[in-house]
Amino acid sequence: MKWWLDHLYSTLLCACFVGCSGSTQGDSVVVIDGHEDFAALQTVPVPAASDVQTLQTPHVTMRSNVRFDVADLADFRRDGQFANFTSFYQQARGRISQDPARPHLAKEGNKWVPQDFDSLVLVSAMHHLNSIITYFIDVIKDNSGATKNLLHVAIYPEISVSGQPEYAVADNASYSFLLDMIFLRQSATQRGVPFSMSSAVLAHEFQHRVFHYNVWNKTAPAQQYYWNKIRHEQQLLDTRSKNLLDATDEGLADLFAVGFVKDPSAFRHVFKGTLSSFRRDLQGGFAQEASYDGLARLDSWYAQQWQCGAAINFQANKNWSKYCLGTVIARALWETAGQDLTVLRQQLLPVINASLQDIGSTIAQQGKYDVDLFFNAVVARATQQNMQSLREQLCLSVWRRFRSLYNPLQVPACFF
């Protein structure tokens, strides 16, 4: 990363170091352009009612020195006293070691400039996530706790499992459902825009939060099912159902990120030149050819050329890639929108978001999951909202990409 830092320092010619707090209303801040090439910088307004020096916006708070043990949180989730997601997460975050994050900034007029790489990560992630949450509120019309509750974001967390340090993780970002936090990992060997500053990656991770809240915390049956399983230390779903739900979650995370950055090849600036950059490109060869049934049969094209792993009928072993099926789901929905970003953003994504609570309710009733459950919920919502063209395209996408599921028993909303 040294060459990258050298470029940063030569680009940001700063005059003074500022270490005090105070209002930054009306100021601007230099961040990484989260959807351009490696060293693209941009100056953006500090969000309203925010303070760039304390890294606080109405939607986001940045944290540092986060340390915790997964086993301790698992025990608390089983034994703790809490009524809902909000109280659980508030108490869980109170059990971990953490500090407010503080960037090193210099000020030129009304412009704040990061003085080191970590500070650039902090202010860039804060800016992008604040914009992402605004997008989910204004465009997607999400009204779950994911957009109502303050998002906590941790830079470089230190995680252990039963006292043993977690295997070193770099070049990544993740959403933790144990703490309702987004983790930003160190940048190491990655060639593209760092995950921690990529608007596509951060939108992907935030959609995981949206999925979690809407599926498990929007309806009483889903809440009861979720917490009953947790209290009794039971798996939420059988292996196959979990694999399919995880793949749905990943596919939607990619699709909502595409909607945010307005680019069906949203991850090309992140995974530069790697297999993932082609496998998760909604305009790429894999997305255009892949199908649910091909993955279920484990055709050699998937296992060898695209490294999708071994999962006969999605009874996966540890080497199976949920991202492969995720791309099939995302591509089917991209085709549903006619590969039109306006239709995707203004029509399809809000309908998908509204349908997520129906998934949780149905899982609570049936105790299992397959992708037909998701598509049936979305088709039913489109029908309720008199979106006939979208409904027809959804059903066509199921027929094209999920042929074995296309029947009146599994996707009845397409037939009645």
What are the roles of these predicted feature ranges?
Residues 24-191, 212, 216-233, 237:
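Acidic/polar low-complexity interaction segments
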Residues 3-4:
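Tryptophan (W) side chains
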Residues 17-31, 413-416:
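Bacterial Sec-dependent N-terminal signal peptides
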